[in-house]
Amino acid sequence: MKVGIPSEIKAQESRVGLTPQSVQQLTNHGHEVLVENNAGFGAGFENADYEKAGAKIASSAADVFNDSDMIVKVKETQSAEVNMLRENQILFTYLHLSAAPELTKGLVDSKSICIAYETVTDENNRLPLLAPMSAVAGRMSIQAGAHSLEKPQGGRGLLIGGAPGVNPGNVLILGGGVVGENAATIATGMEAKVYIVDKSEARLKELQAKFGDRIIPLVSDDINLENYVAETDLLIGGVLIPGANAPKLITKDMLKVMKRGSVIVDVAIDQGGCVETSKPTTHADPTYVIDDVVHYCVANMPGGVPRTSTLALNAATLPFVLQLAQSGYRDALNSDANFLAGLNVCQGNVTYKAVAEDLGYNFVDPSTAIN
């Protein structure tokens, strides 16, 4: 199979779909790999590294799209890229379609085969291709939030871990999944006072077993969230409904009870955000203020650390890329129900139920669509 790796063109995105080491695995199996000129530069990979691994360097994205059977990316396709997709071409990347109606329409119209990293599952119904970037984003959320709390950034002027004789700040983490756990790892390491809200008592017990008395677990059904929001210095939004829009847990009215200069980091912004007042921002202009509350809503947080993120992502995605290249999409997906869960759009059909429901498309069962 011919596999193409274009440069990422989303604002301030420097990750790359495959590392030279991953390319080497593909070429060792007899596949051709075409990499756009300097696609890996931002993540620390040179053209020569890819050529040494057996790839060819293409001068433009158009060449990559035109000459490849499968496109492997990181972030959702931008409009210029959607226009280059063709019927039956495989696209393997993050998509987050429930929050992107225009992108979804473009992919449907292209009649390409669109497999989303974020909805591939495993035997335990976890999300193995979303988890690496969720871990990175969770860790970054505390760093970004702590920085945003500084006075020059518009924050309260508060050191999240406190100081000798000074109490630490309060961190409220919504969601005890991969984002929440990794946010708690950094927040507790910085000696903040950390609250984690989740609807699952079993998950909260797991987190308490890991963190002990360094966290305060809260069952979401048993609390008045507004009371905790009022005492929060840094709020992390890490809730997820796989493939669907995130629930709006924090309303605009709740902002009125928050402290002046407090900070919200909405990691769920890729799926529309879990805060009513969230809107996507970029690394170049990451924050805005509503009702005296700083909002940090960068939609590609892991893109700020492209070296770490690319290596972590490739460790998870490479086996699936190899499976697609070796078997083709029909055999690869038919033989693995967990992989089939990643199919979001196929030959003009929406094949992920949450996306179809959120955006008003007819849902076509993925096993039907590929056969």
Regions found by a protein language model. Give the residues of each.
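Generic hydrophobic/aromatic pocket-lining and core-packing "Φ" positions
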Residues: 23, 47, 104, 142, ...
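Rossmann-like adenosine-cofactor binding region
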Residues: 209-291
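Glycine-rich phosphate/diphosphate-binding loop of Rossmann-like nucleotide-binding domains
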Residues: 6-42, 152-240, 287
